[in-house]
């Protein structure tokens, strides 16, 4: 029987399945950070259990860390406790930890792929909703809750029901300057923020195949923002070339054998999906969100929509509420909306290609008066590479702040946050009310679009800046 990629991955990991019972899946990789793990480790202690396969669990610090100093006390008492607990727990249970002073420390979804922890064909979980990022490798990756974190630590398995399948095909080639972030925002604009609920999404089409691995990670990172359980891109030569030679990747003949298997990880001809969505890549322009969920998004050249234009009463009410919170009026061109802060970073857009794209816009320009702009690399290796390429100097000379790795202003769990009423052009993944700070107003954009907003002081079409 013809199978989708998701069905192949799921079936390959079923440990036990009985009639009328939820299947038990084997978990190949478990990624851990400081926020969702303390209670899970305490649960192990309470029951006298060990981590079943510590070599398949990798930990880092990211959510709470300061991006201005490596001092563990810098982000407040709760953050200090969570980070100290992670150090204690990893030492006690034999889990590898990339702590604040480790050269590989960084955002968990940047660190995993970078170190070859993430490989095609795997099941990967983490107590974080953006675990879908790793689906870019043709891995079944999804976020789990703290009680599930404990279950995986103790058993290396997890009960999971089968999801519905969705194919999202982006046909043709994207125009120059259109990034993975623009593509995925355009997709969510079409599906809505709940359009993928109950599904695992496979992204395909020429525009997807043309993306680098970093672009595919941006794409899959935001699968959760359309309500999907996970996102997938079938592995190909782009994938294999990225993985080759990384720290935890197979070596020599083992790598060749792995590639032979990975090449089978694709949807069979004749396999059927529950839902199919199609977009034309050539029609996608630079995207900017205007509301308080990622589905409230338009092209930078568009005017802010009138709530009355939505036929669905729920969408209309949501648009009215969003405009009120965002302090915007319908009919205004997005390019007339001024910003206060810019955040370039997060597990969506903090990799080296993202920083290069932003630096290309920043080079030779200055951050607009009254704007604070942060650039936060996703990991120690990304920071080191950016500095080796001189990107830090470009940013600093332009008036951007060059920070240490961490989740930073993506979420208000550390010192980087918006003040009430401040408006931010952000390369992160969520624009919910208060996500970047109480009363903060978040607009999601690509790294180049964020840099353009920083140097102009308002949203600007990057196609007119180059």
UniProtKB/Swiss-Prot annotation:
- Subunit structure as annotated in this protein's UniProt entry: Heterodimer of LeuC and LeuD.
Judging by the UniProt lineage, the source's domain of life is: Bacteria
Q: In which pathway does it act?
A: Amino-acid biosynthesis; L-leucine biosynthesis; L-leucine from 3-methyl-2-oxobutanoate: step 2/4
Q: Which reaction(s) are listed as its catalytic activity?
A: (2R,3S)-3-isopropylmalate = (2S)-2-isopropylmalate
Bilayer-spanning residue ranges? none
Q: Its encoding gene is what?
A: leuC
Q: Which organism is it from?
A: Klebsiella pneumoniae subsp. pneumoniae (strain ATCC 700721 / MGH 78578)
Q: What does the sequence similarity comment in the record state about its family?
A: Belongs to the aconitase/IPM isomerase family. LeuC type 1 subfamily.
> What name is this protein filed under?
3-isopropylmalate dehydratase large subunit
Keyword entries, A-Z? 4Fe-4S, Amino-acid biosynthesis, Branched-chain amino acid biosynthesis, Iron, Iron-sulfur, Leucine biosynthesis, Lyase, Metal-binding
What EC numbers are recorded for this enzyme? 4.2.1.33
The GO annotation for biological process reads: L-leucine biosynthetic process
Q: What does this protein do?
A: Catalyzes the isomerization between 2-isopropylmalate and 3-isopropylmalate, via the formation of 2-isopropylmaleate.
Where on this chain does [4Fe-4S] cluster bind? 347, 407, 410
